[in-house]
């Protein structure tokens, strides 16, 4: 799945769209996504000047976005009408730093899959080595229901 299809599914945009490509998807079971970590990411202006490290929370967000694609595709939710929102994170661990130039591979496996609440085990890797892992919980919500009324 290329970036155009990803942008049709996810409401995220620059600078927080953190998925560049979906390499594999097995609806209802698992997904593998890719994030190219560029030195041009705005976060590196402050994290950290002179020794840029990709923040752990960005790795978790990238995992969540990949998991959101799996939820939307697996549950046959209407594209452009739903967003997947965080419901919880358990057992998050950061094993190694992620640097500009790294290619982050994001692997998620379904533990339970429901519109109201899904749970997935996520692993992030660089060069085949685990850099982070977590269990993520998320819920699918209609965009019209989560937009703040001004």
Swiss-Prot record:
The keyword Lyase belongs to this UniProt entry's keyword annotation: yes
Q: Pfam families, alphabetically?
A: FabA
Active-site residues, Swiss-Prot/TrEMBL: 47
Under Enzyme Commission nomenclature, its number is 4.2.1.59
Asked if the record carries the keyword Nucleus, the reply is: no
Q: Mention one GO biological process in which this protein takes part, according to its record.
A: fatty acid biosynthetic process
Point out the coiled-coil segments of this chain: none
Compartment list: Cytoplasm
What the protein does comes down to: Involved in unsaturated fatty acids biosynthesis. Catalyzes the dehydration of short chain beta-hydroxyacyl-ACPs and long chain saturated and unsaturated beta-hydroxyacyl-ACPs.
Q: What is this protein called?
A: 3-hydroxyacyl-[acyl-carrier-protein] dehydratase FabZ
């Amino acid at each position: 799945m290329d970036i155009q299809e990803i942008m049709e599914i996810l409401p995220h945009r620059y600078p927080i769209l953190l998925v560049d490509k979906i390499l594999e998807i097995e609806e209802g079971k698992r997904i593998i996504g890719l994030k190219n970590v560029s030195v041009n990411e705005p976060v590196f202006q402050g994290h950290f000047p002179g020794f840029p490290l990709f923040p752990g929370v960005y790795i978790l967000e990238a995992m969540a976005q990949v998991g959101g694609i799996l939820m939307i595709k697996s549950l046959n939710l209407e594209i452009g009408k739903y967003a997947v929102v965080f419901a919880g994170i358990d057992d998050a661990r950061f094993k190694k730093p992620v640097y500009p130039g790294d290619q982050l591979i994001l692997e998620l496996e379904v533990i339970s899959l429901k519109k109201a609440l899904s749970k997935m085990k996520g692993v992030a890797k660089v060069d085949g080595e685990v850099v982070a892992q977590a269990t993520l919980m998320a819920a699918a919500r209609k965009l019209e229901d989560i937009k703040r009324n001004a």
